[in-house]
Amino acid sequence: LEEQGKRVRASEAVFDHEARKVTWTERDPNQSQPPRTSALAFSEPIQDILTVIYFLRTQKLEVGKSFDVPVSDAGRVYRFSVAVVERKDLNTVLGRVNAVRIDPALFGEDGLVRARGALSIWITEDSRRLPVKAQLKVDLGTFDIKLKRVSYPEGKPSR
């Protein structure tokens, strides 16, 4: 459920990877109007805004390289570039870790977010590939995000 002032919307994306189709449904729970639905076909693997974080963790991240990622959101497909910017030692809740910084180009006129801004995400270079830090810069200000805790199911190793 997304609320922006008086505007409220509930949205859902259903991915059918066998049929290579995504169906997007959006409705206002405060209105009796039928939901707005759109469907589109895709020809390559595609992510939504949440699974893209997992997808980025599975990629080979070499400093100086970049790659494109297709993402479906709000009934459209966006392609954005991800630059692998730097390698850095960070102090984190996990202790001192080697991490790589990626900068997904989400912002801009044709971007997923039609505003000025920048996002950086640091992912550990160990086998866990955990996102331990992020920084979001927008007109409103700069937001620093840090991983606070990691928990594993019983019986799973922590490293």
Predicted feature locations:
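Acidic, serine/threonine-rich low-complexity disordered tracts
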Residues: L1-A19, T58-R159
